[in-house]
Design a protein with these regions (language model features):
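C-terminal substrate-binding subdomain of Rossmann-fold SDR/epimerase-dehydratase oxidoreductases
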Residues: 97, 117-259
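Short, well-ordered alpha-helices that flank and scaffold nucleotide-derived cofactor binding pockets
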Residues: 17-21, 70, 74, 115, ...
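Catalytic helix-loop patch of NAD(P)-dependent Rossmann-fold dehydrogenases
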Residues: 2-17, 21-27, 36-97, 104-105
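Amphipathic alpha-helical segments in well-structured domains
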Residues: 8, 12, 106-111, 144, ...
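Short, solvent-exposed loop/helix junctions and linker helices
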Residues: 6-9, 58, 62, 103, ...
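Residue(s) in the substrate-gating loop at a strand-loop-helix junction
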Residues: 33
Length: 259
């Protein structure tokens, strides 16, 4: 937990202090996570003005990072002082559970699935009914870049927190995601290894993206099945193809969904 706080809280503060120390940064988009919210297991999505919190060290450290961002924004990058005391536009962004090719992190559902499938092993699922807002990594990235471009053009208008989550129908249980991975991969078997003694993990977490939709004109392009299909396609091809070209191809595929 100490390293988690050092990374997520002090790491965030160090970046903001670096921004303060230079005149070359004009826009800062600070990325946290949907887990920054105080999770009450509610059946509707969290809005940007709801309380920060967190049961576990990871979630609470992300909530603390958001509080630090808000503090630095008020104290050092206040919109009212723009052009007088500073020239920085600072916002924070929160996405859902991102998936996509190239993710090999530990204890994440897609990498765990792919590692098991490539090894010819069954996929163990420890929390099958946990519901998450799943989205391909290109979805929030498109939102972050759109926000940054608007902040560049209007530096005092968008200095707030923003949610960039998926469509409502993409908020599904872990088991459904793993099942779809197997379908797209063409083989595999799931094992439910959930036990009552596992570490605490929220069962329900959703984001409300109304603010980004109406104020930025941003909304997700893909549904959950398209997200998983694009992700699995990357993992099936990366060993035999040029990864850079594959990524560019997938960006083009993603952009085509919005036409």
């Amino acid at each position: 937990p100490v390293e988690t706080y050092a990374t997520n809280v002090m790491g965030t503060i160090n970046i903001m202090e670096a921004i303060r120390a230079t005149n070359n940064v004009k826009v800062g988009v600070m990325i946290t996570t949907d887990k920054c919210y105080e999770n009450k297991e509610q059946i509707w999505g969290y809005r940007e003005n709801e309380p920060m919190g967190g049961y576990d060290p990871y979630s609470s450290s992300k909530g603390a990072a958001e509080i630090a961002i808000a503090s630095w924004r008020c104290s050092f990058f206040n919109s009212a002082d723009y052009g007088k005391k500073h020239h920085v536009s600072l916002a924070s962004v929160r996405a859902g559970n991102v998936i996509g090719g190239g993710d090999w992190a530990l204890d994440r559902i897609i990498p765990d699935c792919i590692k098991a499938l490539e090894a010819g092993k069954d996929i163990d699922i420890r929390n099958p009914q946990a519901i998450r807002p799943w989205q391909h990594v290109l979805e929030p990235l498109s939102g972050y870049m759109l926000l940054a471009s608007k902040m560049w053009k209007e530096p005092t208008k968008y200095c707030e927190g923003w949610n960039f989550g998926p469509r409502a129908e993409s908020i599904v249980p872990v088991w459904d995601v793993a099942t779809d991975v197997i379908k797209n991969y063409g083989s595999g078997q799931l094992n439910d290894i959930s036990t009552p003694n596992t570490l605490h993990e929220a069962k329900l977490l959703m984001l409300d993206i109304s603010k980004a939709k109406f104020l930025l004109g941003w909304e997700p392009r893909m549904n959950i099945h398209q997200c998983i299909a694009l992700t699995v396609d990357w993992y099936k091809r990366y060993k035999d193809e040029d990864v850079y070209a594959l990524c560019l191809e997938q960006i083009e595929t993603y952009l085509a969904y919005g036409k």
